[in-house]
Amino acid sequence: MKERSIFSRIKQTCILLALLTTTICQAQNVSNLPVPAPHQLKWHEAELGVVFHYDLHVFDGQIYGQGNNRINPVEDYNIFNPTQLNTDQWIEAAKAAGAKFAILTATHETGFGLWQSDVNPYCLKAVKWRDGKGDIVRDFVNSCRKYGIQPGIYIGIRWNSLLGIHNFKAEGEGEFARNRQIWYRHLCEKMVTELCTRYGELFMIWFDGGADDPKGMGPDVEPIVNKYQPNCLFYHNVSRADLRWGGSESGTVGYPCWSTFPYPYSHSNATDGVQDHNKLLAHGDPEGLSLIHI
């Protein structure tokens, strides 16, 4: 009886040790997982948002052709002449659809700015509409706050048909192109500063196609956003993405879809070891140590 009792206790002790070891290992594994930053939690809570694309091509009467419009400047920017613009109506419609945030293209592929820029002359100051005093970004943000919608701003610096910027790069060769590239870099940084400092707290800053590499000739925008909009979502550059594109514009993502990712940025086809980047964007990586939500 004593031997049976001793063996029973040894067995119980072994089981307890095994369970304890498993629990410790699981706790260690969990402790290695990334956790969302406070602004990333806001992204989850927001659930549904809308994007308002508004640019010169709204008024040219043509079917939008991205390839041509990226390289051909609009001949007469005074075609921009809305007669019934009502950002309250935009945001009321978004709210009725269940949206909790809204994003406006402050500048898109033409390079035309929808605000009163002091650094980019190609903006609403240049047109006859509202005697050159219109500021649609301000109207939009005010409407968002009026109806309890979180405002975000979309900034397109990858393309600028007026200045001949194609995929972040100034067209041309030699010193001519280099000087224009440096000038454009500084212009972008100044525009981002304006948008980050004039309109109060923003939900998101979205760079169309990213913001290029500041270690090369790209604008160094992340420190600007961090300084003036520390709580907003940043999307994105070559070193940081608080959220990610789903790998296609179909409106769907892969299954399963993980929020974890192998590195803290997205849209990098040059990353070693990645064979199918769009697949990675669609599915994420269950073993990833960075958190980038869709």
Indicate residue ranges for each PLM-predicted region:
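Bacterial N-terminal signal peptides that target proteins for export
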Residues: 2-14
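Short, basic, low-complexity termini and linkers enriched in Ser/Thr/Gly/Pro
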Residues: 20, 293-294
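Bacterial N-terminal signal peptides
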Residues: 13-23
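Mature catalytic domains of secreted/periplasmic carbohydrate-active enzymes
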Residues: 28-292
